[in-house]
Amino acid sequence: PCVEAVEWLGDKAFDEAWATCERGDWMLWAYARLYYDRNRELVGCVAECVATAQHLMTDQRSVDVLKACKKYANGEISKEELLSYAIASYEAAEANADINAHAAAAYQAAHAAVNVHSATYAASAAAACADSAAAYADFAAARKKNLKLTADICRRLLPCS
């Protein structure tokens, strides 16, 4: 994903890296590349990561796309149905500049079904939402806390075997 991630990884074995990583965005990136055939699991996990910022979402379309992601992950709706929710969430982001990061995170969660880069972006956007919630009082701490939270979500929801 970036030089920082590669430097952190160093010579760590995959199991060690997965167990100790504190960046959900890096974990989603790795999982999407290693387990590209597990799309529903990935989208479900991305939705859980983005849901860490759901309390900041003020447009119902953004909340709806998170629910749709969970339905997709459970096999209840098709990829095409999920993408229709993603489009609605994108429209929410476009229409409301003040909630752009929150709506964009929800949109990217749904878009992860077709674009692996969206999974990483969604977790980063959730961390950015946490940053804005902290009103920049402790920007780095809020971001770090959210990335650690999403890393724990990844370990809980994504089987790496």
Language model features: what each stretch is:
Residues 1-161:
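Short, glycine-biased loop/turn motifs at secondary-structure junctions and
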